[in-house]
Amino acid sequence: MKSILLIGLGRFGRHIAEELNKLGHEVMAVDENEDRVNAVLSIVTNAQIGDSTNAEFLEALGVRNFDVCIVAISGNFQSSLETTSLLKELGAKMVVSLSLIHI
């Protein structure tokens, strides 16, 4: 069992949350949208509403304590890029980031 931070709960992020739940992993889910967070409460270990581009918010989550951080922000490339960069700066062990733009 791994501890996973999942940021972004759109269609792709929710699917990841469902699969990780089936595999028995501990998942902390984060999104700015309260409805999306509420929709996954039954399938994740914990969930928070917040801005993942805010370094203080990410630091408060304890990103260093997660085995894997997944950035599944698909609608805003800049937010995805900033979040990925912040996670690395804050010492995340492993960062996996979704991009709909080939980089």
Outline where the language-model segments fall:
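Conserved acidic E/D residue at the C-terminus of a beta-strand in Rossmann-like folds
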Residues: 31
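Conserved beta-strand positions in the Rossmann-like core of class I SAM-dependent methyltransferases
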Residues: 28, 96
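Conserved small/polar residues in nucleotide/adenosyl-binding loops
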Residues: 101-103
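Aromatic pocket-lining residues of Rossmann-like dinucleotide-binding sites
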Residues: 20
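Short alpha-helix immediately C-terminal to the canonical SAM-binding loop
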Residues: 37-38
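Glycine-rich Rossmann-fold phosphate-binding loop(s) that bind the pyrophosphate
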Residues: 9-10
